[in-house]
Amino acid sequence: MLKFTEEHEWLKIDGDVATVGITEHAAGQLGDLVFVELPEAGASFSKGDSAATVESVKAASDVYCPLDGEIVEVNQAIVDDPSLVNSDPQGAAWFFKLKLADPDAANALLDEAAYKEFVA
């Protein structure tokens, strides 16, 4: 299941684990990324908490935790090469995997059609 937030994060949900990243729209707005800071595996976040930071030549921005949960894995590849976020934001450049405290809460997030309408 693919879901989106109004803060421009995407979530690919598989059971009780969501892979989280920023959308193509967000990556395009930020421009070329030069730095990514990710949370530590094992850290717990509530929905809306700042979980990661990205810096581009234009601005620094927070990446928010889309739902309550615990970080179970981070993508070291985007720390080593932030430009991956620009080239494949909704694929290889995921940010972290989140074990969801309440997987059903994802139903309240936007689906792809609603997100496309939101950014149109």
Curated annotation (Swiss-Prot):
The modification N6-lipoyllysine is found at residue 58. Pfam families: GCV_H. Its cofactor is (R)-lipoate. Gene3D superfamilies: 2.40.50.100. Binds 1 lipoyl cofactor covalently. The keyword Protease does not apply. It comes from the Bacteria. The keyword Iron-sulfur does not apply. InterPro entries: 2-oxoA_DH_lipoyl-BS, Biotin_lipoyl, GCV_H, GCV_H/Fam206, GCV_H_sub, Single_hybrid_motif. Signal peptide: none annotated. GO terms for biological process: glycine decarboxylation via glycine cleavage system. Residues 17-99 form the Lipoyl-binding domain. SUPFAM superfamilies: Single hybrid motif. Keywords: Lipoyl. The glycine cleavage system is composed of four proteins: P, T, L and H. NCBIfam families: gcvH, PRK01202.1. This is Glycine cleavage system H protein. It comes from Rhizobium meliloti (strain 1021). The lineage of its organism: Bacteria, Pseudomonadati, Pseudomonadota, Alphaproteobacteria, Hyphomicrobiales.
